[in-house]
A protein has these predicted regions:
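C-terminal accessory regions of radical SAM enzymes
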Residues: 113, 128-197
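Radical SAM [4Fe-4S] cluster-binding motif and immediate context
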Residues: 1-117, 122, 135
């Protein structure tokens, strides 16, 4: 309700007509999305929405996407991450390549643009996996794609695995993160840093 009140204020008093929903979990609660979209539709606002930072593909269905389009959505970013199923499985993404293709297709059928996020340099990844990722990005009906280098984040299982295997040093992790995701903070044994760059 607070978000709707803020949108009302910004729309009415400041003439704002476009809103970025920066919430990775926005589509996780379908009932909330339905309620939110219906509230916007009932207001009859001339308004546009997008999710530029990404939502989970496995939360999307045609009913939700159609309602979002009716409420003013024009664009979704989605975290696809890899075109390699073994890499997706190791990341515990709970998606498969077939699902990626299906979900991107229904997003487009609902009339929304799609932007994809991908990660390269994941610990189990090979050059062949990276080629599969690039090929998937080219194959999908995306308006754009962002390829970020893998960054092992402290507190994650993959960070701990890399520390335990001697691939990174825990005390040096701040050096890894004084950079952008375009920088290479870690490179798998079989892929030189220069190749990832």
């Amino acid at each position: 309700d607070n978000v709707l009140m803020e949108i009302d204020l910004l729309y009415r008093d400041y003439g704002i007509r476009e809103f970025y929903i920066v919430d990775d979990n926005f589509t996780a609660d379908k009932a909330m999305v339905k309620k939110f979209c219906n509230e916007i539709i009932n207001r009859k606002y001339d308004i546009a929405f997008c999710n530029p930072n990404g939502v989970r593909l496995d939360t999307l269905d045609m009913e939700m996407l159609t309602l979002m389009k009716k409420a003013g959505w024009y664009y979704l970013s989605v975290g696809i991450e890899s075109g390699s199923q073994p890499v997706l499985d190791h990341m515990k993404k709970r998606i498969n390549i077939t699902l990626v293709r299906e979900k991107v297709s229904i997003i487009r059928k609902a009339g929304l643009e799609v932007y994809g996020f991908f990660i390269v340099g994941y610990p189990t990844e090979t050059l062949e996996d990276i080629k599969k990722t690039v090929n998937l990005a080219l194959e999908l009906d995306l308006i754009g794609a962002n390829f970020s280098c893998f960054h092992p984040l402290p507190g994650t299982a993959i960070f701990e695995m890399l520390v335990q295997n001697g691939k990174i040093k825990r005390e040096k992790f701040t050096e890894l993160f004084n950079s952008t995701y375009a920088d290479v903070a870690y490179s798998p044994d079989n892929i030189p840093v220069k190749t990832l760059k």
